[in-house]
């Protein structure tokens, strides 16, 4: 009943709110606003509605994930919309994202809430036993909403660069006249907003004691202080990166942005560690169906699906298994990134390296947790036969949807989910938005760029980048060698990028990391696949390079033509 009441309150009020994707504005119906203001539950429902706009990527492009527009993977079916990112069909008319629409709608809802629903007293409920707890939760909503608004602005700037900006409900005269605010100014605003609310928002929902309203679970998916600091830290990293940092490398302005990024990531890490957070032992538990409990030591913020499903598994479990489509297939390019456990180097750094050999033995343990390969057993765990990804095999080409790369995706798939018609099962999925592992890497990158080498320290930053980057490698059940001493800057930077690709694979980072580094032509102009052939009991391998289109205009998305038609003040991104 409570859930229905929340949803009803949400639908009642937002049926009359502005449609932000069109930047249009309509006044609230006063009766409906007043109706929602009567109860804690209905006002809370408005905030819950905004949380539902958080982004995830369990196959946003008809099963394809954004990773398949990068060198992480290739979608196994031709003609999917994901190909638009690299086949020349991308354009303002074919803008390939709902981010503009969804973010501006969410921002409008945030502005509406902050202007219309703060400062309430709920005096009719003063005599209930948990009035104090309900008011404590209610008074926190405004800080959650301010975080969410800043979060949506970050997503917009990351994708479009300069964007229209408003922190209030638009008047009729303001509609469709907004100009684009410089990206760096929006980043500055996000960081300032995070600083203003970080000590006001609830620090930790698991330590509320008597301030937990009756009937409520202490565990929530809501923003807390660490979430706010995570947004600040990631924003500072992006603001300092080449795509947004217009200062000459090595200049004072350049270093100031990297200093801010290092300081912000250090602040988050120290806050997390002070709260007892750490890297969990089992890498794969980060995306387990119960990650919200068994990975809570590392997870800072995530977006949990509202119900148990099996659609992601149907899209990505190997072709040849019942009701499975193959989907997003990891590339040989990604496989190459997993280093050898003995020595901590990529196979292609070996003196006797042969590009047509896969070097599966002795690899970084994260490889087998992320990627399914030929001969793997119990993938998924109800499959009783070894995978056959060689040409003509049971899970391979020429079957429709057979892996074009030689591999299948494991990460984010729940291995226990059964997709058969006779025994179908479902389970929970949580999209990782922020986790501690990312910020150790962010901090290492910022330190390296600010201090100039991976081994430098000072009084404020006593731990060098080289030690910080090794933390994800030293996870108990990963236990890869630390980064070595004595690497020059070029080699260290390449090794750092490789570590980031491996640790954060398929978590939605690669698409944006390569863009903020302005290295699109280097990484996204081709991918490698591995064609496998069987003869008797032996296998042979042939590396295949698949070319893709890259143009530097792709560092930012095009502004949708439909939005430009509504607002003549919107300028288009360069090249589009």
Report residues per predicted region:
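Bacterial Sec-dependent N-terminal signal peptides
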Residues: 1-28
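Flexible, polar/acidic helix-loop-strand segments at domain edges
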Residues: 298, 354-436
